Amino acid sequence: MFEQKAAVFLYAVSPVHMGAGQAIGVIDHPIQRERHTGHPCFAGSGIKGAVRHSFKSLGGDENHINRLFGPESGSAELHAGAVSFGDAQIVALPVRSLKGGFVYATCPQAIARTQRLLAHLGLARNWPTLPEVAQGSCLTVHA
């Protein structure tokens, strides 16, 4: 269906909260989570909407924006946009370190999922073998 595929890594410089749109008590939008893993995620539709909004706020031509992203919901025009966004998944997150500052934490499952996604896109080559990490343990890597 689509002619080209690409992976995009998003890096948040401030706290991000993608709400699931379901109210629970005081929290009006619980964090979006994948149904099958329970891991936090960003729905592709939310990312697409944010990118569309950025194009619009930068003064992008409305016709080009509609061709790229599709018409606004509720529009009389009904056609799909030229781009599609998949859901974003967490690869690593900053965690406060006892030695000062923050470190990036991840897990073998998150790394393996990223490897599979990049391999599907034809971008992954010769990944090193992931070391085994025992339950309740951690492994430090210095880059």
What are these model-derived regions, one by one?
Residues M1-A143:
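RNA-binding basic/glycine-rich loop and surface signature characteristic of RAMP-family CRISPR effectors
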